[in-house]
């Protein structure tokens, strides 16, 4: 199992992104910040990315999936605490 940070920019705010939010719920992602989520999964980053990307319909949308190592050196205030529970 690995923890991934998922970050996105939705470039078309008036578009219906509910399918993306449902996809995040389906993989049991936790909402960390406005457009940042965390997920603990046995799937590789590419699988997570491809699954979510199919729910983003604007070619200008941005999606970033990166491993988050709990032992990594980082600084956060009121955000990363939730990721430690994944």
Describe the predicted segments one by one:
Residues 31-37, 45, 51:
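Extended, non-catalytic scaffold segments that flank or surround catalytic motifs
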Residues 54-86:
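C-terminal structural segments of small proteins and small subunits
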Residues 5-7, 36-38:
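Short aromatic/hydrophobic contact patches that present stacked aromatics
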Residues 14-36:
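Short, flexible N-terminal segments of the mature chain
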Residues 6-14:
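Short, surface-exposed ligand-recognition loops at beta-strand->loop->(often short) alpha-helix junctions
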């Amino acid at each position: 199992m690995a923890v991934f940070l998922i970050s996105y920019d939705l470039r078309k705010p008036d578009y219906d992104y509910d399918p993306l939010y449902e996809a995040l719920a389906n993989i049991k992602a936790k909402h960390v910040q406005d457009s940042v989520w965390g997920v603990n999964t046995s799937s590789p980053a590419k699988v997570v990315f491809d699954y979510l990307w199919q729910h983003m319909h604007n070619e200008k949308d941005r999606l970033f999936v990166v491993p988050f190592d709990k032992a990594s050196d980082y600084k956060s205030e009121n955000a990363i605490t939730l990721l430690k529970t994944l």
